[in-house]
Amino acid sequence: IHAAYVRLDARWEQLSFVGGLRYERTKTDGEAFRFDVDTNRGVLQNVDRSYGELLPSLHFRYELTPDSILRWSYSTGLSRPHYPDTVPRLVISDEDREAEAGNPDLKATYSHNLDVSWERYLRPLGLISVAAFHKRLQDPIFIGTSTIGSGVESLRITRPENGDSGEITGLELAWQQTFDQLPAPFDGLGVYANYTWADSEADLPFGIGKTELPGTSRHNVNFAVFYEKHGLNTRLAYNSRSAFIQEFDAADRGLDVYWDRRELLDFTASYQFTSQWTAFAEINNLTDTKQRRYQGVRNRVLELEQFGRAWQLGLRFEY
């Protein structure tokens, strides 16, 4: 990847501006064996691709008051496909009559992004913010499953494909506050809360309809309580996200694959007892949450994962 950019900064009293233009040139080379059904042999196939994109951006910041800021921005972005997904590969499982394939024609996803936000800084140390965003996507990437053949000779192939376009519209609310005004020892307490609502829609490949964007939950919640004082730092954090689509089925949308709603509770703590030594502890997934993947409807379970709690204790030395 080669890139070059220009940037302009300007300020007029309470209004400041940052603008830029970035050019990125991407080149990929790869090779893999492709199975040839006519010769019943593997054939070495080379894939060479290159493309360039212009990525403009505009960012405005206006100080309504010393403690209140309004922001507006337009930007563009490029999300490249995972390199293994672009390799011309085909891995077949004879037992399940299923296969995974790469897609050498997979395109990068280009996005146009609009964001507007209002921030209010709280005393002694805190923040309230409200933000809205809208993104338009070109060539979003999906993981799709299709079936070739019929009966016992059929084969279900899963591979990445590009859709035509998509969009996401959302709202984000955030609040962070430390309570320095409380009497000791409670003056080290603080909270952080964040909620994001996102509505997404995209055209599926092959013109078979529309769906939500893969990996995009409609609801995301984060909440944390923390304590920071005299070298002691502790944090109890809760995260929740609603169900989201992972894969679509080209023949039967009732077989689309989803990850179910998930909730996690994590705890971290550290204590710096000298300028160089810090003891720390981390416990992830305190509630031993299970993760469920289902097909079409929630009671058609494909996979149930339970990894348990993860513990980590240690000492950190800095010099």
Predicted features by range, described:
Residues 1-67, 91:
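Signature of Gram-negative outer-membrane beta-barrel scaffolds
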Residues 4-10, 58-62, 116-120, 173-177, ...:
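Residues on the lipid-exposed face of transmembrane beta-strands in outer-membrane beta-barrel proteins
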Residues 133-136, 154-248, 287:
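Gram-negative outer-membrane beta-barrel transporters
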Residues 240-249, 270-319:
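C-terminal beta-signal and adjacent terminal beta-strands/loops
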